[in-house]
Structure formats: C-alpha cells, structure tokens
Amino acid sequence: MLSDIDICRSTPLKNISEVAKQAGLHHNEHQPLGQYKSKVSLTSLERLASQQDGKLVVVTAITPTPLGEGKTVTTIGLAQGLAKINQSAMACIRQPSMGPVFGVKGGAAGGGYSQVAPMEQLNLHLTGDIHAVTVAHNLASAAIDARLYHEQREGLEAFEARSGLKALDIDPRRIVWRRVLDHNDRALRMITVGKNEADKTINGFEREDGFDISAASELMAILALTDDLQDLRKRIGRVVLAYNNQGLPLTADDFNVAGAMTVTMKDSIEPTLMQTLEGVPTLIHAGPFANIAHGNSSIIADKIALKLSDFVVTEGGFGSDMGFEKACNIKVKASNKKPDCAVIVATLRGLKANSGLYDLRPGTPLPDSIFNDDQDALIAGFENLKWHINNVKQYQVPTVVAINRFPQDSAQELNALKQMITDFDPSVSVEVSEAFGQGGEGATQLAHAVVKACQKQSEFKPLYHSEQSLEEKLMAVAEVGYGAASISLSPLAKKQLAEFKLHGYSDLSVCLAKTPLSISTEAHIKGAPSQFDVPVRELKLCAGAGFIYALCGNVMTMPGLPDKPAFMSLDIDSKGNIVGLS
C-alpha cells in the first residue's frame, strides 16, 4: 500500500472554492488561501441563523497505544461514509501541533484513504493559527516582564508619576503565565529569564520561568471555546497572568495587553476549510491537547458545520476518559450543544496492548507479535473496551463501536471481538471500519449505524454542574469519570484551591491533565483499573477559558523528543516535495 503522503499526492483534489460552494457557503463568506484551503468568515452564521442544526457525532476511543488507534481516520472515514450513503456531512478536527509531527506521533491528518488533504499543508503551519496563538501568548509574557522591570527599576510612585499608569505591584514569585513554543523541547521546561552582567538590570530582573507547548496555552483553549470576536476579547481580558504583593490576581486587562492579544488572534478565530480525499468539506480549527488541555476542536467550527450539514463528525483527543469527558463537561457547557451520538474507536492491537501482556513505550515500534491471533490478550484487553462503553453510556449518549481494521488483522479475531461486544451490551451497535484502506466505501456500514443511533433521543447528562464546589467537581471526574477510589491534593493544590474560592472562581469547570496511556494517572497501568488514587500536584487557573486545570501525576505541559524523533525522516526533494511525513 502507498504511504499516506503518496496517496494524498496521487488523489485529484477540488479547488477550495468548489468545496466551499458544495458545503453551502457563499463566495463572500470565505477567503481562499491558495487552491486548497480557505478561511471561513463568522458572518456566515448570521445568514444561517435560522437553519436547523444537524446531528453532532463525537468520535472517541479506547485507551490508545502511543501511536493512536485511528480516531482521525475514523472521523474522516465516517464523514466520507455518510456522504457515500447520500447524507450531507462535514468533519471538524483540530489543527495539528508541530510538536507531535516532529516528535513521536507524526501527522494528524488521518491516514490511508481517509485523510484531510493536502496533508503536508495541514500538518505544517496551515494558515498560521497556532503561530498567532503563540505570538499573542508571548506578547503577554513580554508585557509582564516589561512592567515588572519599569516598576521595580523606578519604584512604584515614580513609575506612576512618569507613566500615568497605576502600578500593579507585581509579585515576581507569583507570575503564573509561562512562555509557549510549538515544539517538544524538554530543555525549556525550567529556565531563568532576566539574567544580567554583575550590578546591571538592563535585561530585566532575574526570575524563574519556563515554556509550555503552544497547544497547552490558555489562549488555545479560549480559541476553541469562544463563539465570536467579542467573546474572545472578553475571555482574553479575564486571563490571570500574575498576582500582586497583596495576593490579588492581575489579568491581561490589568496589564492593558488583552486588546493587542486579541488583535494578534483576530484572523485565527476563523476556521480553515479543507477537504477529505473524497471531497467532503472539513473545518480545521484550534488545537488544544486532550491530556494537558481540553482536547476538542472549536465551538465555532461546530456551529458553522451544524448549520451547513445534516451530520457533523468531530473528535475528542485520546480515550473517552480524556477528550470525550472534557467535551461533555467543558465544551458542552460553553456551546450548549450536546452530542447526538458517540463513536468509540477500538482496535485489536489497542485491546491487546491493554491486556498488560505487552510492554509498549512511546518512541518504540510496536512488536509484530501484537498482530498475531492471541485470544488470551484480546479477552484480557477487552476489559478496557467494556470500561469505555460504560463510561460513554453514563453520559446517556447513543453509542456505536467502530473497530478500526488494520491490514494485518485477522477476520477470525475481528468477528470474535464483534461477538464479545454484542454479548456484553446488545444495545451498542458495532461495525468494522475499513476507512483506512477503502475510504468512505469502507465506512458505509458504520455510517448507517451512526444515522440509526442519531435517531434515538440523547438524554445527555454531564458529570457535574456549575453550582457544585470545585472539590466536588474534581471528585466527580476522578471517581465517576475515571473510576478512581479517591483524589488527593498536594499541600500546594489545597492552598491554590482555597485561593481560587476566595477570588470567586468556584463556578468554573475542572480540566484534569494526566497521562492518556492509562485510565489511571500511571501510564503503565493498563486495562480497566479501579480503586486507584488520583494525585493532584498543582492547580492552574484558566479564568478566560472557564476552567481550573489540575496537573495529575507526573504529566508535563512541555513534551520532550524521543531518541528517534519523527523529524529524522523528514526531508525535501529538488522540486520542493516533502518526503517522510506520515
């Protein structure tokens, strides 16, 4: 079989203006950027306001291997499958971060014959939205250190007299806004800024700082959760950057930088229209990770797509304990749009990996033996799929299981897995998806199952409500969302929680950051663990995004590169063609 990039290059694509017309957009509602991508104006929503919304289908998965189990392949393949059975469909996915593209996972455009195209444009820069988020974020960092420098150098009274501004009296030990970069670079996790020659302060005042990956920026979460430009401006204004020496929060509005940050991001609020290999319109927008952020594409993209099509297929990152949980408890609260159907992606290799009989690690290839018939491993790993089915069903959303077939999978094991699912829960539809190898044609049975599931009434139920305390919300996600026995807060987390309550942030949602490779907070614990503790080492306030962010276990907000990163395979030929991107 051809590589992903070769399949993409050998497939004729439509001009993006034709794709936009097919989607139902007027020519003045999008701005083409080249032949194959276009920015979609929010003015389209004004014209479409009276249109009835389509059905929202959220694709999630079992606990994945480090290489993923094909959620994006299934998302794109399902949208193509729906089009094959004459349903009006669009897909909405996140913009890939270049950190994973150059790191372990590679690209995030789907794969095989279920890709967003051109895949190299999607995976590398696209329309620069992540760059805009990075620049806006680091503008705030520059504003903080500049203000700290001038206030400390002159003294507060002299600063006020000279500048006409009110001194913020920043506590340099409590600057909570770290810098960001769209790369995996562990060396930048802890740094010192403002270093000077002896007895000089020209470079600012020395303090500890660090970098997160851009996908973990609160601005990325805001971009995914906002619904218009005015709301974007308000949310950015509420972002807490630091605290003063009286312990009060200082926001982007306090630093008078929120307006400039919003200006920097004004074009990034528009989703990017692209197409699948079969010409299905696809909106790309925002890119928060699901392990260290809320992990879903944007509300704006969903709103536009839901007005233009009968079925919108989107995805939440990693397993249902990660992106799907956050879709239900964070995204739905902001959008007020509940999912009509959930699709759980499972694979034979992923279930065997969850058996505990294989030692799989990020950055190392999967052993060939994982594709051999192994009933014991499949039965043991099936506990993980059972857990995810029960987890999704507790939100009372109609559920379909899609078994994503790899070329090495045996028909005997696929049939055995289908029967195991039916025996476990006859109410859950299950179909084998061959979207990777066959495109939409390989996902038509899955598409029929999704259409049927969407005809059922979704009695959506979140895990918690705004009026509950922050402790109750954290416990709800840990104990009900993960099946944990308890949650334990470090002394620092307890102190932060009390402070957030004092400053009036108790109504916010909670976003738990943990490993995606286990339902627990320990990556090596596979299957369907129970009776474990969720240790919260630190809490971060995302007042603009609307959630409290809990760092659990040893999760990092700046990834590192493996010993053999994906960038080693990337190159370019004499004609400008990129090679080695997958």
UniProtKB/Swiss-Prot annotation:
InterPro entries noted in UniProt: Formate_THF_ligase, Formate_THF_ligase_CS, P-loop_NTPase
Annotated protein name in UniProt: Formate--tetrahydrofolate ligase
Species for this entry: Vibrio atlanticus (strain LGP32)
Lineage: Bacteria, Pseudomonadati, Pseudomonadota, Gammaproteobacteria, Vibrionales
Gene Ontology process terms (BP): tetrahydrofolate interconversion
Swiss-Prot/TrEMBL keywords: ATP-binding, Ligase, Nucleotide-binding, One-carbon metabolism
Keyword tRNA processing belongs to the record: no
Pathway connected to this protein: One-carbon metabolism; tetrahydrofolate interconversion
Keyword ATP-binding in record: yes
Family per record: Belongs to the formate--tetrahydrofolate ligase family.
Binding, ATP: 65-72
UniProt cross-references to SUPFAM superfamilies, sorted A to Z: P-loop containing nucleoside triphosphate hydrolases
A GO MF label: formate-tetrahydrofolate ligase activity
Record Pfam families: FTHFS
Reactions catalysed, as given in the entry: (6S)-5,6,7,8-tetrahydrofolate + formate + ATP = (6R)-10-formyltetrahydrofolate + ADP + phosphate
EC number: 6.3.4.3
